[in-house]
Amino acid sequence: LFFGLLFFFTFTYLRQMIGVGIAGLSFKFIYERKLWKFVIVVLIAASFHNSALILLPVYFIPIKKYSIGAIMVLMILCLLIGVSGASSSLFEAYSSTSGLEERTTQYLEDTSGFRVAYLLEAVFFLWIILANYSKIGKDKQQIVLLNVALTFCAILLLFIRSENGGRLGWYFVLALIGTLTVVLSTSLKNVLNKLIVYAVVVFLYVRIVLGCGVLLTP
């Protein structure tokens, strides 16, 4: 489903999708603690689309599993910031240093109110991850992918009032896929979890085809 969605977007947001693919190669350098290789890969991704620079702070997230309580506090804080509209200042700061004032203004003006879809998406993924938190290993690779996946949810909540907020989260999707693969490979043994996940899969498939099929037209 994720790759299918990215396939649709490739026809409309080609440069950014290329950047997303390249940025995904940078995750291994986080848990290998190779800063310069990480930066180089992110900069290459940014050469296709400047928004890839949002990945740079991820390297400095400590490689450890945080408590569920700490994660919930962070997510609530991100939601409050997003609802307040204060996150738009991030776009403004980026604008002043990148010379993209006109494009950034378009991002800021593209606020269509509270994005319920972002909230539902973030809550659903958080529920799956946190409900199966103990199943996620403690090796560096899984922890890094976990933290990047949680960052994906945080980004959705931070930019919950922006139509373009979801696009910033694309750079974290590959880590989310990796984390969900680990979680669902064990949790699907539970019948209830299996029914819920399959129901969501069918719903998202229909939503993607009906909602994004138009993006097949350049």
Model-derived features with residue positions:
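Hydrophobic/aromatic-rich transmembrane helices and adjacent perimembrane loops
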Residues: 166-182
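Alpha-helical transmembrane segments and terminal signal-anchor/GPI-anchor hydrophobic tails
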Residues: 56-168, 214-216
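Transmembrane and membrane-interface helices of multi-pass
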Residues: 1-5
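Membrane-interface transmembrane helices that cradle and orient dolichyl/undecaprenyl
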Residues: 23-36
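Transmembrane helical bundles and short interhelical boundary loops of multi-pass, membrane-embedded
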Residues: 148, 163, 175, 195-218
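Short acidic/glycine- and proline-prone juxtamembrane loop motifs at membrane-interface regions
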Residues: 11-17
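Transmembrane-embedded, aromatic-rich helix segments that form part
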Residues: 38-41, 51-61
